[in-house]
Amino acid sequence: MSESIRYTIQNELLDLYDDVKVGLSDLNEQKALTINGPASKLFKRATRMSYIQGQKQAIDEMNQLLETYDEDEQFLEHYNQLASRIRNDNIEKVFSLSNLTDIPSHFEETIADLYFSKGQNFIIKHINSIME
């Protein structure tokens, strides 16, 4: 059964990676419309890009774990560490945004970091749901 979990995760990561590629493709197709549109569209595009980049990094990290650890027990141990780190990072980013005092100088970076973390967190939650 452990092998089937790893196999399921690998297949799910391939599907998620395809979703990331589609998301990036959609962003590229809409680039001209966004750049010529209102600032709110640029902001939305930037947050979407950060979110997708976070998803891609989480997928890449999980694929690396699958390649590095052949034993399911070792993989799950390191996966749980990764998932915990990403969850904690997401909580930290939300807290950081809520406590932002110097909005003009740090707002863009804080929002980008938050959406990057949210993208990673989405992947972890999705993988956790199929492992249950």
Task: Name these PLM-found stretches.
Residues 3, 7, 18, 33, ...:
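Residue-level marker of intrinsically disordered, low-complexity segments enriched
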Residues 86-132:
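Amphipathic alpha-helical binding modules
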Residues 1-4, 67-70, 129-132:
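Short intrinsically disordered terminal tails
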Residues 1-36:
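Leu/Val/Ala/Ile-rich N-terminal alpha-helices, chiefly Sec-type signal peptides and the beginnings
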Residues 22-88:
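Amphipathic alpha-helical interaction modules
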Residues 3-6, 10, 14-17, 42-45, ...:
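Amphipathic alpha-helical coiled-coil segments with heptad-repeat character
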